[in-house]
């Protein structure tokens, strides 16, 4: 857990279920980013709408020496490609209407209980 050093806004509590006491014992953002950078090194990153996560990380990393250059796979784009190139073309409009992580979990019959919960989102994304 990361302690942002600022008050956790109500939206963070509602959407991500993060309470102030959840982050109080967390590590500082700089330490978390250093650990993350070391962990991902040259690995392929996978995410749902992964460009959003990458943009946030690039902004937080700040200087050019640490910019992320990892290859990335976006599960939303993979799903879109499958729809456009697979046997489901007749359902394309309906299937493309909602490509949220929860919607894709439903389409692919994956258990998904709690959106915007980091571990749950990561687990479902990995299964996609």
Kindly give the residue locations of the regions a language model identified.
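Short gly/pro/ser/thr-enriched loop/turn and capping motifs at secondary-structure boundaries
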Residues: 76-80
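Acidic active-site catalytic centers that drive phospho-/nucleotidyl reactions
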Residues: 53, 74, 121
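Conserved non-catalytic scaffold segment of RNase H-like nuclease domains
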Residues: 1-70, 84, 91-110, 116
